[in-house]
C-alpha cells in the first residue's frame, strides 16, 4: 500500500509522466508498469478526495470564482474553481460545457461542501452571474450571495489555475472525461495538502 500511495503522490504532486514515475520507482528497486500506476491514480484519487472533504479546514466567506479550459479527447472542457480571499481552495469541478447549468452545478457542490459565501468575485461571464442569481432566488434563507466584478481580485485564482495546469503540461491531454475528472481531483487534493488546508495535518496521507 505504501508503494501505491507513493506512486500516486509522485504523479499528482510533480510534473511527471507515468513513465517518469515508473522510472523513479525502478530506481528505488520497485518494478511497476506505468499503466499500473495510471490505474492506481484512477482508482485512489476519488477515495482520497472523499476523505479530504471531511478534513478540510473552513474557508473564508469571500470567494474568487473562475473557470479554465482543459483538453479532453481533443476538445475543450472546463474546470470550474474557486479560492477564498487568502488563496485557499474552496472547490473544483470539471464540466463538459461552459454554461449556466455548469456554473450552477459547481456552486451547488462548493456551497454543499463549504457553506454559503457572503460574496463571490467573478469575471463578466453571464453564465456565472445567472447561476448565482438562481441560487439566491431559490435560497431558503434571507442570506443572499453578493457578487462583485473586480478583475485584479481574480488574479489569485488565475495563478492557482496555473499551478494545477502545470501538473498536466507534460501530457498531450486526457483521452477520456472520467480519467480527466479523477486525475484532476487528485491534483487538486495535493494542492490543498500543500496549502496546509487539512485539519490534523501531522497525520500522513502518503505513508
Residue ranges of predicted features:
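Residue-level recognition of single "structural anchor" positions
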Residues: 1-207
Amino acid at each position: 500500500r505504501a508503494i501505491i500511495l507513493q506512486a500516486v503522490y509522485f504523479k499528482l504532486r510533480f510534473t511527471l509522466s507515468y513513465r517518469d514515475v515508473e522510472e523513479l520507482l525502478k530506481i528505488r528497486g520497485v518494478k511497476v508498469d506505468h499503466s499500473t500506476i495510471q490505474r492506481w491514480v484512477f482508482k485512489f484519487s476519488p477515495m482520497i478526495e472523499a476523505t479530504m472533504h471531511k478534513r478540510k479546514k473552513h474557508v473564508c466567506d469571500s470567494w474568487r470564482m473562475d473557470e479554465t479550459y482543459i483538453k479532453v479527447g481533443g476538445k475543450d472542457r472546463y474546470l470550474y474553481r474557486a479560492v477564498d480571499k487568502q488563496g485557499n481552495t474552496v472547490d473544483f469541478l470539471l464540466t463538459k460545457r461552459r454554461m449556466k447549468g455548469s456554473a450552477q452545478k459547481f456552486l451547488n457542490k462548493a456551497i454543499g461542501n463549504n457553506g454559503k459565501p457572503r460574496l463571490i468575485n467573478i469575471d463578466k461571464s453571464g453564465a456565472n452571474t445567472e447561476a448565482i442569481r438562481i441560487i439566491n432566488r431559490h435560497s431558503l434563507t434571507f442570506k443572499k450571495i453578493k457578487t462583485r466584478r473586480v478583475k485584479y481580485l481574480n488574479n489569485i485564482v488565475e495563478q492557482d489555475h496555473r499551478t494545477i495546469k502545470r501538473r498536466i503540461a507534460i501530457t498531450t491531454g486526457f483521452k477520456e472525461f472520467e480519467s480527466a475528472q479523477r486525475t484532476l481531483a487528485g491534483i487538486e487534493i495535493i494542492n490543498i495538502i500543500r496549502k496546509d488546508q487539512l485539519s490534523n495535518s501531522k497525520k500522513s496521507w502518503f505513508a
